[in-house]
Structures are given as C-alpha cells and as structure tokens.
Amino acid sequence: MTMHYGGDYNPEQWPEKTWHDDVRLMREAGVTMVSLGIFAWSRIQPAEGVFDFEWLDTVIDLLHEGGIAVDLATATASPPPWATEAYPQMLPRDENGAVYWPGSRQHFAPASPEYRRLASELVTAIAERYAKHPAVVMWHVNNEYGCHLNYDYSDNAAVAFRAWLAAKYQTVDALNAAWGTDFWSQRYTSFDQVVPPRKAPYSRNPAGELDFKRYTSDTLLDLYLMEKRIIRAAGAMQSVTTNFMGAFPPADYWAWAPHMDVVTDDNYPDPNDPESFRASAFARDLMRSLKPDTPWLLMEQATNALNWRPTNAPKAPGQMAALSMQAVARGADGIMFSSGASRGRAARSSTRRCCRKPAPAPAPGARSSNWGPSSPHCPRSRRAPATPAWPSCSTGRTGGRSATPTTPSCSTTSHSCSAGTPRSTGSTCRSTSYSRPQTSPGTASCSPRSSTC
C-alpha cells in the first residue's frame, strides 16, 4: 500500500504565476496529495449566488497533470464578509452574550439556519462540479469542528438546545429529574424556559452543562453529516472525512468515527515540551482505535516553528522525522502538513517552505519506507502517483476545463447518511487529556492539549 505525503495547499493566497512552480516543487519533494480550498469560501463565492471556479479549475488541473491527488475541502469553516454582513444573526456568542465578530475563522453559530443554508449552497456547487474529477480522491468537510469556538451560547443555540433536550427527555418532568432542578429552585415547567449555561452569579447546574456539551458535539456532527449527504447526492464516490484534533473534549470522536470514511488528525506537539510528544503518541493511538481496520491519516502537523504559542520554538534536527515516524508506527497511512509555505501577512503561519533541503539518507541497513530513499522529513525522489489507501472512484468530470474521462477505478461500500440522534443519559465524556503546565524559562506556560488548532 502506498502512503500519502503532502499537506495543505492554499494557492488563493499566492499569485497565479507561482502555481506552476508550486507543483514542480511538490513533485521534487515527493508530494502525493494536498488538501485544497479549506479557507477559500470568499474566493469560490465572492457574493451570494455568485460562484467563481475558474481559478480552482486551473489549480486542480495543474495538480492532476503533476500526478498529485487532491483532498478537496468544502470551504465552510470561515464564512466570507458578505455572508456575515447580510446575516449577522449567524454569528456566535460567548457565555456573556458577546458576539464573536468576523476577522478570524470559525465565526459561525453551528445551529444558525442562515449559516446552514449558505453552507449547503456552497457545498452543493463544489460537489456537483468536482465529484467526478480524476484528481479528487477525498473530501475534506469544514475544518477542525469546534476549534477556537468550543461552544456557542447564541439564541440559535438556545433554540436548538431545547429541541435536543425535548428529543432526549421527551417530558419536562424527566428533564427535571435528570438535572435535579429542585436544587436552588431551578425546576422547569416548559422546555422553552431552558437556556444554554450562560454566565451566572455562581456555579451552574452541572447536569445542564454536561448536556450542553453533548448537544454541542451532536450539533457539530450533524453539520458534518449535512455536508456529507450533499457530497453523496452529487454522485461523489470518494471518501469523506473531517479532521480531528486528538483528545478534544468538545467533540465525542467515538460517536463521530462511524461516520468517517477515513480518520484524520491534526497534531502540533510543542518542540520545547517533551510531555507533548507523549501526548501526541496518545493521540495517534486514539486515532487508530476510533475505527479499527479503517485508514487513518495525520492530516496536519507543523513544518517547523509556529506563531501562535507564547513561545514558538523551531523543531530540532530529527524531530520532524521522529514525529512523522511516530505516527507511522502507530498505524498512520499518510503524513501531511499544515501550511507548506510561509504566508507572510497571514494570521497563522509556519516559518519556511517545507522541503527546501533534502533530508539525510537513511542509515545503512535501515528498512526502506514508502516515501522512497529519503526520510519522511523531505523525500528527494519523485515516485509514481499514489494509489489511495481508501475508496476512490474517478470517472471524469462534468465541470472544469481539461478533464479526461477514465473508467471507474474501484467500487465502494454504501455510506450511512442518517443524522445523528441524542445519546442516552448514560453517555459519558471521553478523550479528555491535557498536557502539564511548563514552568521552565523559554517554554510555553500551558499547553491545553497536544492537538491544538
């Protein structure tokens, strides 16, 4: 089985004149697959009802001509300014009622009807255009659900939370019994009286907080399933996934995993913190265990130093290869990176273009890997285009500019597209893990989890 090697590719952040050079460098580096269009909503849809696919057609065709497969994103993780201007009610709120304004990412209320409608229209347009493109081997839904914005306390969330509670408990009396609402005179007579666990004078009902966290995980999963159904309805037969974040408390990945065709993980251990390497090993074991006998992929890791920790250390010589092989040793079927090129003015960036220098050759007698004769840090040899390790059927495409029809390359099993349902009252939170605080000079003060966003 051939293993995939590559990373996020953001051509919309670069002049078109660099795209050919990008593909050439990828070929020299042995890249076999890139994740494309993750944050490209504003470029794909510059206005409501208006779509511009010409640039994306060009990029996908260039990658295909270069033998590089595409993990095509649905681009729904960051709504464009025109959307939030027209529909400000889609913006999320914190527990104090303050609005999370545009200007970053993940600025959408998961339960917002306006966001869901706009996201559905975007995904429909993308899926219908590229479902049959021979370069597309996988679909990347949204990005890191729950990242940066763990919980939304908006009015949209309040309405959806009440509906979730009504579906779970059926009656208000059952809710009162489960939450122990006679304590502090909290007894409800209607589901409409329930609000999300917003800021209160003192500690809030812990049972209510737990249910709100379960509701949040289920709501985010429902968003994923909504997009997956649209992709399947467009006739796309490739695998569909979204990227997990290790031991991430806001999402119950054990409930999500059955709906993933490929399990993927984003992992950013701190080069200054040995404990984070152990935490990343745990995260990799977690990914392998979520859906046994299913491929899992390290979707994101840093190419070197980051810019979002209190202290941002570069990786020491050998760390890149060691962390990559740590994932391979724990069953990863591919090694990918985030931001293979520096983005200059971007809010988040790695410091250099990946794979500018060849890595040392393996030690004599070392077992050769699927990356070719070089280490996974920066393979030097160009291999034949990879054969995906998961279901992929390419039959040519109906949109775009230079598709070459091909015969179907595989068959795939049916996929479940039914929406999730609230879990029983016996459900428990899983996968909580935190790295220990650091106190030594020059290190990060605290790392909340090994797989940060």
What role is predicted for each listed range?
Residues 1-5, 30-32, 64-70, 132-137, ...:
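Short, well-ordered coil/turn segments that N-cap beta-strands
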Residues 7, 26, 34, 63, ...:
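Conserved, mostly hydrophobic/aromatic
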Residues 191-194, 246, 257, 265-453:
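Carbohydrate-binding surfaces of carbohydrate-active enzymes
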